[in-house]
A protein has these predicted regions:
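Short beta-strand segments in beta-sandwich/barrel cores
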Residues: 206-208, 223-228, 241
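Functionally critical, mid-to-C-terminal surface segments that flank or help form catalytic/ligand
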Residues: 155-213
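Structured binding elements
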Residues: 218
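Transition-metal
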Residues: 1-82, 142-172, 197
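An exposed, glycine/acidic-rich loop-and-rim segment of catalytic or binding clefts
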Residues: 93, 99, 110-112, 117-172
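Short acidic-glycine-tyrosine-enriched beta hairpin
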Residues: 99-112, 228-248
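Short, structured beta-strand/loop micro-motifs enriched in basic residues and often containing a Trp
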Residues: 89-97, 222-226
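Ligand-binding loop in jelly-roll beta-barrel domains
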Residues: 27, 35-40, 56-58, 68-71, ...
């Protein structure tokens, strides 16, 4: 009955697939996507739900580093305390990189870009991103890139200056390193008030369960295999993402991933 149905139509018709509390008028709470980073992402910040501007929404996100070239690095938070005016001066002078932490990234790391944290990524990396379903981004420095008309892309310095977390960060110490928990294992990876991330390792087969309180998304980063449910097999390979409705119950994953 769902074949050919767009995802937004599906959750509108079957809101209980998201959670018992979800309404057909609600916005799906998260986005799951890949970022293929070659050129630097602009140094940016996202507001929280509390300090987002009129008509805007907060945005928290987590990056899982799938692969990274030698030299790939993240920009993450301020090195030392500075004022709003100093921050804007650095952004306009093109010297913001001098006051932002930089750290190498490695496959298996999780970086939590909480609302207010200055962040960017460069040097060649594939990232699996989980985020609040929001596109609110305040661009602070864009490495002097130009748009199709040859103009420097717009910055959002006034908005950014009001929401930035000015607490100095410690760079690489903020990374969570993912580790394999076993041959067939599901282990906790990262949790915040907006979403939870777990690591699934499968060498043969594992039994899992999707309970009534929430949906699950299975994002496969490597390997191939099948999801087994109610006597059916649903094939997957690296890059596939499956939505499992709340209350689905017991299912299995077989293969290698």
């Amino acid at each position: 009955p769902y074949e050919g149905m767009a995802f937004d139509e599906y959750i509108s018709k079957f809101p209980q697939a998201v959670s018992p509390q979800f309404s057909s008028l609600d916005k799906f709470p998260i986005l799951v996507k890949f970022l293929d980073v070659e050129k630097p992402i602009s140094i940016q910040v996202h507001p929280s739900d509390e300090n987002a501007g009129p008509g805007e929404e907060g945005k928290a996100e987590a990056w899982y580093i799938v692969s990274a070239n030698p030299g790939a690095r993240i920009y993450y938070g301020l090195k030392e305390p500075i004022t709003k005016e100093q921050l804007k001066q650095h952004a306009l002078a093109g010297t913001l990189e001098q006051v932002v932490n930089q750290a190498p990234v490695q496959p298996g790391q999780v970086w939590y870009n909480h609302p207010g944290i200055l962040h960017s990524l460069e040097g060649g990396a594939l990232v699996a991103e989980v985020q609040q379903n929001s596109d609110t981004t305040y661009r602070v420095y864009d490495f002097n890139r130009k748009d199709a008309q040859g103009n420097l892309r717009e910055l959002h310095l006034e908005k950014a200056a009001e929401v930035i977390d000015y607490t100095p960060q410690q760079g690489a110490e903020k990374a969570i390193q993912s580790k394999k928990a076993g041959a067939n294992a599901l282990s906790a990876l990262f949790s915040c008030e907006y979403f939870k991330m777990k690591r699934l390792d499968v060498e043969t087969r594992i039994e899992l369960c999707c309970k009534e309180e929430s949906f699950q998304c299975l994002l496969f980063l490597e390997g191939k295999g099948n999801i087994l449910f109610a006597g059916e097999r649903f094939a997957f390979q690296a890059g596939d993402c499956y939505f499992l409705p709340a209350g689905l119950g017991a299912y299995e994953v077989e293969g290698a991933c």
